[in-house]
Amino acid sequence: GKLLFAGVVNGKNIWKNNYKKTLDLISSIKNACDNNINVVISTSCSLLHVPYTLKHEDKLADSYKIHFSFAEEKLTELAELGVLADKKQDKVKSENAYIDNQKVFEEERNCHNAEVKERLANIKEEDYVRLPLRSERQKLQKEKLGLPEFPTTTIGSFPQTKEIKAERAAYRKNEISEEEYTQYIKKQIADCVKWQEEIGLDVLVHGEYERNDMVEYFGEALEGYLFTQKAWVQSYGTRCVKPPVIWGDVYRKKPMTVDWSVYAPVSYTHLRAHETC
């Protein structure tokens, strides 16, 4: 006979599988196949796209964790679905694995924010148009900045050295104060600005020393996200990241970049004032 592999467990997302829906899908697939075709259930793709396991996420509340399924958990889901799919339909609903799974989907997730809902409901067509227009902004920027036709600059993010990573780790472990950490980052920014000025770049950047992974850093300044401890996934090559999980309505609870954006020009002004003296 022939084998048909059915990718019934999503290998790319991190969410728990709904057994009721998946068992209905498996039943439909089997009914559509000839008798000489054996259906083998599988994940929809390799599990390299998802974190390894939920076992070590001890800082994530169980009320959140029950909704997730990483690589190991997806394999457990496959095993349980395989057993349930072989049982008669009237027997499935009495199985503990099925009962426990369906409990998760019976309650609505608490993930909504009334203010976000209201703002979305009141969006108007003109809100999608940025003013002034791009052509006007270009003219204003050219007049104000006085840059050459092809200005020299760098990519915004400078290397995160082992010293910077060590300082950030010490701050997260409460081994140094927020003030000590802030002053350290300010010095890195000031040195970065000074170096760019010395080599004659036209457009300076502040180096982005204040952040770790960009997505994680910005996510921490927003509501509506959850954060994991060990849920690493591959970004590219040997680089791995822990992306925040979009849990509910996302909104900005505080300024994200204002403090550093304000400090960088100040450090440049101090540098130029010192050179003038």
Residues covered by each model-derived region:
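Domain-level signal for soluble alpha/beta catalytic cores
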Residues: G1-E275
